[in-house]
Every structure is written in structure tokens, then in C-alpha cells.
A protein has these predicted regions:
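Gly/Ser/Thr-rich active-site loops/lids in small-molecule metabolic enzymes
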Residues: 175-180, 229-249
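ATP/nucleoside-binding phosphotransfer catalytic cores, i.e., glycine-rich phosphate-binding loops
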Residues: 41, 201, 232, 242-288
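Short Gly/Thr/Asp-enriched flexible loops that form oxyanion-binding sites at enzyme active sites
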Residues: 92-106
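Glycine-rich beta-strand-to-loop/alpha-helix junction loops that act as flexible
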Residues: 34, 88-90, 111-113
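Catalytic core of DAGKc-family lipid kinases
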Residues: 55, 103-107, 113-212
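ATP/NTP phosphate-donor binding region
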Residues: 17-85
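Glycine-rich phosphate/pyrophosphate-binding beta-alpha loops
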Residues: 159, 214-228
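Cationic, low-complexity basic patches in intrinsically disordered or flexible, solvent-exposed regions
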Residues: 4, 10-12
Length: 288
């Protein structure tokens, strides 16, 4: 029997993050994921120690020790009256902290320290931790949207199907990187079984047999892989990307398009903006 997997909608102007601007004294908490991209994380810690303005901030640094610990630390920061929580980590940690802060008056600050850094890149945050820390020092705010997938907030992407299967396999790898992701995609494509999705988007009903459906709040997965080039983090909408069936050789073409920002121009891709969407699947499948 069919299973409802996603009820997805954006929440407009739901999360603030720290941008360049006016300098102010603030109480903040810094959360560090110690297993996130070890080289980036170590450099981030050095840059925090060297460049964070101690005259402007009252702060403490806490490291996550177990799965979802960042959520607990973020809730503590809110209870303690912090005005911002700064996360030095990758997309997973950033999403945990951001989702916890969504709907509060506490801002999210990001020092990118992961392997993909999709949301950070979409927001124009420097991949250089020195500049990211200096950005925190300036302490200006920008408000962005979040998405809701089955009631759970997300900052960047949600989806079902092939890309979720690749992401699941990728996260289990000790060695990561562009080539590893490409090869895992090839392997998963050979094994992955497509299914038909029943979709209701803002009252429009249709069916699609597809490799995947992504719901994007921002343009990219990470590493400048632009799955939804026209997505905006502050337009009050989410961008749906439906990858229709394609011949095996087209994987190479689509992968190239993904990094050229032209995926939406492929005849195998359907994109549209929406405010609310419900997806029903033929069978349970991995999601993200």
C-alpha cells in the first residue's frame, strides 16, 4: 500500500544568520563538531582563537560528543539567553542547530567546516574560516526561510529517491570527495529501482515516475553541485526538482550539468516552485 512520506512547505523568514554589518557586543555560544572535516575543523578552532573579538563577545566553546548533541547544546544556549549560536561544522550539524533555532529570536552563525558546505556556499559565507570568523565579528543579521518536511525544519534540502540513496551511502564512507561521490552515484544508479510518485503541489495533482524528487530551499547540495539553480532562501517558496527516467549514459551529462548550474535546462528535469507539496510513494524508500 502507498505510504505518505513527505508533507513539505516553506516557512518564510524563519531563521536569522549572522552577516556582515554593524559591530555589537553579544553573548554567544560556539558549537564545534569535532568529527566534521578534521582539517577544516582544526583550522576553524585556530581562527576562532585568533580572530574572534573578545571585547565584543561573551562566549564559550562546546564540542559535540554524540549524535544530535548539537540540538541539546543549542537548546541550552537559547535557555541561557544567548543572542546567537555559532556552529563550526558541516551541513548536518548546521541543519541541527538551524532547525532548533528556527522560529526563535536567536540567530545562527556559521563557520563552514564540513566537506560539502551547501547552505554556507548558498548564503555566500566564505569557506576561509578566518573570513567567516571576521564575518561573525561584524554581527549583522539576515532573515531566511526554512522548509518543513513532515513537521521537521530543514535549512537546505529535503528529498526522496536516488539522491537520498547516494547521500546515505556517501555518509557511510571513510574516504569522501568529488570522485568518491561520482563513483557512488554510478554504483547506486545501476542498483536503484525507480518508482511512481503521486504528487499534490499547491492543489495541482499529477504522477511522475522518477529517479528522485528534491525540495530545495537553496540552490545546491554542496561543493557547488547546483541541483536547483533558481532557488532562493528568502522568496517564501521551495523549489521542486524532479529527475525523470533517463538512459544510463545521461548520468554523465546530468552530473556535468549539476556542476555547471544548467541541470534545470535538461529535458529529463522538471522544476517548479511551490508552497506546499504532498508526495505519496509506491513503496518505502530512503529520504533526506
Amino acid at each position: 500500500s502507498a505510504q505518505l512520506r513527505y508533507s513539505v512547505k516553506p516557512k518564510q523568514n524563519d531563521l536569522r544568520f549572522v552577516e556582515e554589518g554593524v559591530r555589537m557586543k553579544r553573548k554567544i555560544k560556539i558549537i564545534v563538531n569535532p568529527v566534521s572535516g578534521s582539517g577544516r575543523r582544526k583550522k576553524a578552532l585556530r581562527m576562532i582563537d585568533k580572530h574572534l573579538d573578545r571585547e565584543k563577545f561573551e562566549f564559550e566553546i562546546q564540542k559535540t560528543e554524540y549524535h544530535r548533541h548539537a540540538i541539546e547544546l543549542t537548546n541550552q544556549a537559547v535557555a541561557e539567553g544567548c543572542e546567537a549560536v555559532i556552529i563550526a561544522g558541516g551541513d548536518g550539524s548546521i541543519n541541527e542547530v538551524g532547525a532548533t533555532l528556527a522560529g526563535t529570536n536567536v540567530a545562527l552563525g556559521i563557520i563552514p567546516a564540513g566537506s560539502g558546505n551547501g547552505l554556507s556556499r548558498s548564503l555566500g559565507i566564505s569557506m576561509n574560516p578566518k573570513f567567516a570568523v571576521e564575518n561573525i565579528n561584524n554581527f549583522n543579521f539576515r532573515t531566511i526561510d526554512t522548509g518543513l518536511a513532515n513537521g521537521m525544519p530543514f535549512m537546505n534540502m529535503a528529498g526522496v529517491g536516488f539522491d537520498a540513496a547516494v547521500a546515505d551511502a556517501f555518509h557511510k564512507q571513510k574516504m569522501r570527495g568529488f570522485i568518491k561521490y561520482f563513483l557512488l552515484g554510478l554504483k547506486t544508479l545501476r542498483e536503484y529501482k525507480l518508482q511512481t510518485y503521486s504528487i499534490v503541489a499547491d492543489g495541482r495533482e499529477f504522477e511522475r515516475r522518477a529517479h528522485l524528487i528534491s525540495m530545495a530551499n537553496s540552490p545546491q547540495y554542496g561543493n557547488d553541485a547546483l541541483v536547483a539553480p533558481k532557488a532562493l532562501v528568502d522568496d517564501g517558496m521551495l523549489d521542486a526538482v524532479v529527475v525523470n527516467p533517463f538512459p544510463f549514459y545521461q548520468y554523465f551529462v546530468l552530473f556535468y550539468r549539476l556542476f555547471q548550474g544548467t541541470l534545470n535546462e535538461s529535458p529529463h528535469i522538471k522544476t517548479f516552485k511551490f508552497k506546499e507539496m504532498k508526495i505519496t510513494q509506491e513503496r518505502p524508500d530512503v529520504s533526506h
